[in-house]
C-alpha cells in the first residue's frame, strides 16, 4: 500500500481534526501540517467556485490570528474577504453568526488541524473535511497532479511560508509566575528586530492596540481581549506569543514568508526559512 501515490488521511477519535500525508516530488512521504491543510482547502474552494461561476462577491473566509498569513494572500488575490479571530472555533462560529444573512461563509480553519467547510456545523468537522480532501485529490488527479503539486502551485502563486511552533514548558506555580513575567517583559521591552529584520508592527490583543515602528497606534477590531502578542518584521516574518490556556507552557508561533519562483525551488526555500526560524529563536532567547 505504501507504493500507491494517493494521499493518506486520518481523523482524531472525536472527528473534529483531520491529518494527512502525501508523497513529495521525490516519492517520499511527508506530513501536511495544519497550516498547509487549511491553505489547500481554501485554495481549492475559492478556485473551484470561480471556475464554476459561483462567486457573488459577498464570500468570506475565517482564520485564527496564529494561522498562516498565506490564507490572507490567497483571499486577497481572489477578492475574497478574510476575517482574523482568536484561537478556537467558537470565535470562527461567532464571525459566521455576525455575517449570517449578509455574506456567504465558504470556509475557515486554524493551524491545529481544524477546518470547517460549511456553516451548518459551527465547529471544526473532520467528516466534511475528509470528504473535501478526497474531492481535492480527485480534482488534482484529473489535472495530472498530486496533492504535493497543488501545495507547490500555492507557494509559487502566493508566496512561500514556513510555520514553526516552539513550546516553552514552565510547570508549577513558579512556572506560571515565570510565564506571566515573560509576557510583562515582552510588553514593556518588545523586540526591536528579529533575525536581523526590523519589527515594523506590534499587535497587543490585551490592549487591542497595534503600534507600528513609527509609533502610530491603531485599534484592533476584536470582540474581546486576549493575552496574545504579535510582531511583524520588514522581511515578512510573523511571531505570535501566548500562554497556553490548558497547559503550563508559553507558545511561540513563528512564520517565515518569502518568494518561491518554481516548484523545484521548494527545498532551498524551506532551508532558507528554517535558518530564519533558528535566528528568530536566538533573538527571543529560545
Regions found by a protein language model. Give the residues of each.
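Catalytic or ion-translocation cores adjacent to nucleophile or general acid/base/metal-coordination motifs
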Residues: 33-45
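Short Gly/Thr/Asp-enriched flexible loops that form oxyanion-binding sites at enzyme active sites
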Residues: 16-34, 71
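Short, electropositive, low-hydrophobicity segments enriched in small/polar residues
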Residues: 19, 23, 38, 118, ...
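A generic beta-sheet turn/junction motif
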Residues: 13, 245-247
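N-terminal small/polar loop signature for handling phosphorylated ligands or for N-terminal nucleophile
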Residues: 1-19
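Phosphate-binding and adjacent anionic-ligand microenvironments
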Residues: 6-7, 28-30, 48-242, 249, ...
Amino acid at each position: 500500500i505504501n507504493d500507491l501515490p494517493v494521499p493518506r488521511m486520518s481523523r482524531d477519535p472525536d472527528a473534529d481534526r483531520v491529518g494527512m500525508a502525501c508523497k513529495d516530488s521525490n516519492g517520499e512521504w511527508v506530513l501536511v501540517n495544519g497550516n498547509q491543510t487549511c491553505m489547500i482547502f481554501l485554495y481549492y474552494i475559492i478556485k473551484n467556485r470561480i471556475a464554476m461561476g459561483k462567486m457573488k462577491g459577498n464570500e468570506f473566509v475565517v482564520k485564527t490570528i496564529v494561522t498562516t498569513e498565506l490564507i490572507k494572500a490567497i483571499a486577497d488575490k481572489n477578492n475574497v474577504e478574510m476575517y482574523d479571530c482568536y484561537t478556537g472555533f467558537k470565535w470562527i462560529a461567532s464571525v459566521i453568526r455576525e455575517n449570517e444573512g449578509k455574506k456567504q461563509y465558504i470556509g475557515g480553519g486554524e493551524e491545529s488541524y481544524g477546518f470547517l467547510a460549511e456553516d451548518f456545523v459551527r465547529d471544526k468537522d473532520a467528516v466534511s473535511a475528509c470528504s473535501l480532501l478526497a474531492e481535492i485529490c480527485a480534482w488534482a488527479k484529473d489535472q495530472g497532479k498530486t496533492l504535493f503539486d497543488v501545495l507547490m502551485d500555492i507557494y509559487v502563486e502566493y508566496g512561500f511560508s514556513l510555520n514553526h511552533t516552539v513550546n516553552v514548558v514552565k510547570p508549577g506555580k513558579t512556572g506560571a509566575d515565570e510565564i506571566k513575567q515573560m509576557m510583562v517583559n515582552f510588553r514593556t521591552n518588545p523586540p526591536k528586530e528579529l533575525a536581523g529584520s526590523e519589527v515594523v508592527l506590534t499587535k497587543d490583543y490585551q490592549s487591542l492596540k497595534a503600534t507600528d515602528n513609527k509609533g502610530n497606534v491603531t485599534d484592533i477590531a476584536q470582540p474581546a481581549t486576549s493575552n496574545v502578542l504579535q510582531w511583524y518584521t520588514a522581511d515578512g516574518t510573523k511571531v505570535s506569543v501566548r500562554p497556553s490556556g490548558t497547559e503550563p507552557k508559553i507558545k511561540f508561533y513563528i512564520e517565515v514568508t518569502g518568494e518561491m519562483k518554481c516548484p523545484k525551488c521548494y527545498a532551498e526555500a524551506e532551508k532558507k526559512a528554517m535558518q530564519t526560524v533558528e535566528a528568530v529563536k536566538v533573538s527571543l532567547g529560545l
